[in-house]
């Protein structure tokens, strides 16, 4: 299908996972391959996915496939050994290191169980030493840094510290998601510091979403499409599959005034640059 040709989805959930998913990784890869999608990053909040990426690539060599590791509790937080292992999995499919997401202090303190434990990133307005050590490791290994579900203030601190360490590729993951909720000004600051900002279908397509396609388009207009990336965050068992998410997201961007050139930049060119494919 022409609308999918060349897209790279940097944020796709699929089974196996502890959370119910609409497709498994092979079903997702087949669906994307058949539609002409160029590549996918497999994202899991509980486990590293470099090994899955290896298996998917073996079955679907036409696809660019990468894995990620999220520094949540189940990984051990700022666990350098886990990240090193992730990069050593056969053929080097490990690409993105995410700061805590579901285990982030910022998300936990806004959730239903506010007394739950979390993986801290900062204290007293400063990044923790173990976080700075992790950034050193990411820089040394040439990996992509995602700011996870950190607070807006922490996100800016992470980007500044990453740039000081010459981390080349930085992703602000779903900044308009309810648990992060960056302002447009904060997103523009992140972009000006050299990060990419990710806009996911899930935040506008999930039941009860308070963010709209119009909100996305307005933010992208302020930030500039050159620093923005579109992705699905698809795979929730209670929502339509990834391809539907993409169809809706692309249509929503066009309906709100973004050009085909800008949409291609955000769904093809920018993700390729983030992943070192261009």
What are these regions (language model features)?
Residues 61-64, 72-173:
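Extended substrate/RNA-proximal surfaces in nucleic-acid metabolism proteins
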Residues 225-242:
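Short acidic/histidine-rich active-site segments
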Residues 136, 141-212, 229:
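Catalytic pocket-lining loop regions of alpha/beta-barrel enzymes
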Residues 1, 53-62, 85-93, 136-138, ...:
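Acidic (Asp/Glu)-rich catalytic clusters
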Residues 1-63:
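An N-terminally biased module of ancient metal coordination in phosphate/nucleic-acid-related enzymes
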Residues 6-12, 40-42, 66-69, 95-99, ...:
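Hydrophobic faces of well-ordered beta-strands that scaffold small-molecule active sites
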Residues 245-278:
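Mid-to-C-terminal alpha-helical segments outside catalytic/metal-binding sites
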Residues 13-15, 45, 68-74, 100-104, ...:
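Active-site beta-loop-alpha junctions enriched in small/polar residues
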């Amino acid at each position: 299908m022409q609308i999918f040709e060349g897209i790279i989805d940097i944020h796709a959930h699929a089974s196996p996972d502890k959370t119910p998913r609409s497709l498994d990784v092979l079903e997702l890869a087949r669906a994307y391959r058949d539609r002409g999608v160029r590549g996918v990053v497999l994202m899991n909040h509980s486990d590293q996915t470099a090994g899955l990426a290896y298996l998917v690539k073996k079955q679907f060599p036409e696809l660019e496939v990468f894995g990620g590791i999220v520094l949540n509790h189940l990984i051990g937080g700022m666990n350098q050994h886990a990240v090193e292992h992730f990069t050593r999995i056969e053929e080097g499919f490990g690409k993105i290191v995410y700061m805590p997401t579901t285990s982030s202090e910022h998300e936990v303190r806004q959730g239903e169980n506010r007394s739950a434990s979390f993986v801290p990133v900062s204290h007293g307005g400063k990044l923790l030493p173990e976080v700075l050590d992790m950034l050193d490791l990411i820089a040394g290994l040439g990996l992509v840094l995602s700011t996870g579900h950190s607070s807006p203030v922490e996100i800016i601190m992470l980007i500044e510290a990453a740039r000081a360490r010459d981390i080349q590729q930085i992703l602000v993951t779903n900044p308009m998601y309810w648990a992060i909720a960056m302002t447009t000004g904060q997103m523009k600051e992140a972009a000006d510091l050299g990060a990419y900002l990710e806009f996911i279908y899930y935040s506008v397509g999930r039941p009860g979403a308070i963010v709209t396609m119009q909100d996305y388009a307005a933010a992208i207009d302020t930030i500039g499409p050159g620093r923005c990336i579109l992705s699905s965050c698809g795979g929730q068992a209670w929502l339509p599959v990834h391809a539907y998410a993409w169809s809706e997201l692309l249509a929503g961007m066009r309906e709100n005034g973004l050009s085909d050139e800008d949409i291609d930049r955000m769904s093809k060119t920018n993700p390729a640059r983030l992943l070192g494919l261009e």
